[in-house]
UniProtKB/Swiss-Prot annotation:
Expressed by the venom duct. Belongs to the conotoxin O1 superfamily. Keywords: Amidation, Disulfide bond, Ion channel impairing toxin, Knottin, Neurotoxin, Secreted, Toxin, Voltage-gated sodium channel impairing toxin. The modification Glutamic acid 1-amide is found at E26. The lineage of its organism: Eukaryota, Metazoa, Spiralia, Lophotrochozoa, Mollusca. This is Delta-conotoxin Am2766. GO terms for cellular component: extracellular region. Disulfide bonds join C1-C16, C8-C20, C15-C24. The presence of a 'disulfide through disulfide knot' structurally defines this protein as a knottin. The cysteine framework is VI/VII (C-C-CC-C-C). Its main location: secreted. It comes from Conus amadis.
Length: 26
């Protein structure tokens, strides 16, 4: 999964924590 500040997939929500808004937001 992606860390905060990394680019992410808004559809799959592939962040370790928090939410995805083009980048992961803790």
């Amino acid at each position: 999964c992606k860390q905060a500040g990394e680019s992410c997939d808004i559809f799959s929500q592939n962040c370790c924590v928090g939410t995805c808004a083009f980048i992961c937001i803790e």
